[in-house]
Amino acid sequence: MSKEERPGREEILECQVMWEPDSKKNTQMDRFRAAVGAACGLALESYDDLYHWSVESYSDFWAEFWKFSGIVFSRVYDEVVDTSKGIADVPEWFKGSRLNYAENLLRHKENDRVALYIAREGKEEIVKVTFEELRQEVALFAAAMRKMGVKKGDRVVGYLPNSEHAVEAMLAAASIGAIWSSTSPDFGVNGVLDRFSQIQPKLIFSVEAVVYNGKEHNHMEKLQQVVKGLPDLKKVVVIPYVSSRENIDLSKIPNSVFLDDFLATGTSEQAPQLEFEQLPFSHPLFIMFSSGTTGAPKCMVHSAGGTLIQHLKEHLLHGNMTSSDILLCYTTVGWMMWNWMVSLLATGAAMVLYDGSPLVPTPNVLWDLVDRIGITVLVTGAKWLSVLEEKAMKPVETHSLQMLHTILSTGSPLKAQSYEYVYRCIKSSILLGSISGGTDIISCFMGHNFSLPVYKGEIQARNLGMAVEAWNEEGKAVWGESGELVCTKPIPCQPTHFWNDENGNKYRKAYFSKFPGIWAHGDYCRINPKTGGIVMLGRSDGTLNPNGVRFGSSEIYNIVESFEEVEDSLCVPQYNKYREERVILFLKMASGHAFQPDLVKRIRDAIRMGLSARHVPSLILETKGIPYTLNGKKVEVAVKQIIAGKAVEQGGAFSNPETLDLYRDIPELQGF
């Protein structure tokens, strides 16, 4: 098996091993590696061998995984993929096959096994939904949708919390061949309309109110304005979520109906039966949206087959998930992690739908659920782990966490110190996996792996079938050095197209304008040639390059945020008219600490010692707020545009849009 040539820095720091795989445990990855070796006559001794085969012979890899995964289909494929086409050609996958995404998620016949656990802030009760009950509910939703005229290709949307209703509505839409899209109640009216108005939905599901952070938030006024901005809607289904229907007034929302009445329209004397439209592998399943922090969100169309087979690969092989697992992913329906989570049902595992704050009534709320339910896998944001560390929480002392074997972190790079915190203060025997990908591929390029050690500060490995490299500006792969994250070969989970992008120009500009024919993901990373692990260095559109030294903002954050005086930070470039660049670091001070010259000096010294003199920011300034997206990601690009004097279209994508004004007309930034 040929391997990449890896010229470059071999003097990578020896990484600290935090976890090692159990050599006695026969994982699904091990079984797949053995099956491939037997079927293809290959000696695949390690994950590294399997990975390199999977990207060099990617057509064979996906064919073998199709068999291994047990995908349910009504017609087998004629061809896996045309290997003469590159990733920029967006080749069709598994041509000729017919299947249904929802059928694959609802195929498990142990009817009394729990599929969903529903937990909500402020409610003690945990509601259980079995696979049989889920099938019955999806059948009701689908029958009512068909009755009102929803058909293949129509758009059905949810403006919903993370609840069973969102899962049921999505699976019903998928069973028909309609296209699902969703946003969460924390989106404002503009943010919702920026997204949904582009795709002209026929049907919307929503709720009358939600509870978050100890408060009830009425949703009806926002819903009313959203409906007004969506002229193609034929029906608005309102789900009583906090109040009973007697206390909800629908009179101001045209074509509105309560959920019970909507479901009743599809029933007759006999309960409706589930029907699954048999559709091409490439049939659209989801429309996902980019963050919209610098303009109108892009509408990415993801196929049913591509999403299914990619998610199965991640859950079965990389996550070693089985039907005995229970996963809690702290997410909203407006984030791709929700879609990723729901696909877990295809493995027969159960998932916990939690709606509410992860810090109310106490920061232990998720750990309480882990113990009460017996959760085996917890998926959360890197930021939440940092918050727990700041609050000195020690679940290892307060909770048993007996069944928990995996914690996955996503949303932003996981800091090296967070690895130490998790293994010291949460559980020493778990696999801590940092996973990274994006909405663009509705999945991961790299992530967790039960076949490999966990090294402090590194994502374990590139995922099977994902031909990922770090490239320099000249388009050459670099090892042990910072580079642009690229994918060089076709993958079934890339968008089939963008909605309303007939000539494909937006699609090409988004991924293929930097390196022709090669997917540039917009992230900056470094691949360790010794361990194969990856360090994410931030968005490449936020890459810093003062005096010809390229580095990612997270390299600065990792140092700065170890200072107890600093609550948060933001690092962006500023350019003058000659396109010369300097680095500006903004600090948000922790409560009880003042911005002082001594702190600035200590931070400069720490960056100089930890990185180099050329990494030291030109200016370090105080700010009262750091802008974040609704999904908890720092917004560097919009701030970069503001300090350059450019207008920023907010796109309703910010959790705290008022903070953007803090970066306008800063005196210290004038005259550069």
From Swiss-Prot:
Tissue expression pattern: Highly expressed in kidney, heart and brain, but low in liver.
Record GO biological process: fatty acid metabolic process; ketone body biosynthetic process; positive regulation of insulin secretion
EC number: 6.2.1.16
Keywords: ATP-binding, Cytoplasm, Fatty acid metabolism, Ligase, Lipid metabolism, Nucleotide-binding
Catalyzed reactions: acetoacetate + ATP + CoA = acetoacetyl-CoA + AMP + diphosphate
GO CC field: cytosol
Any matching Pfam family: ACAS_N
GO molecular function: acetoacetate-CoA ligase activity; ATP binding
Main localization (coarse): cytoplasm
Location in or out of the cell: Cytoplasm, Cytosol
Superkingdom: Eukaryota
Annotated family: Belongs to the ATP-dependent AMP-binding enzyme family.
Function per UniProt: Converts acetoacetate to acetoacetyl-CoA in the cytosol. Ketone body-utilizing enzyme, responsible for the synthesis of cholesterol and fatty acids.
Protein name, per record: Acetoacetyl-CoA synthetase
Organism the protein comes from: Homo sapiens (Human)
Gene: AACS
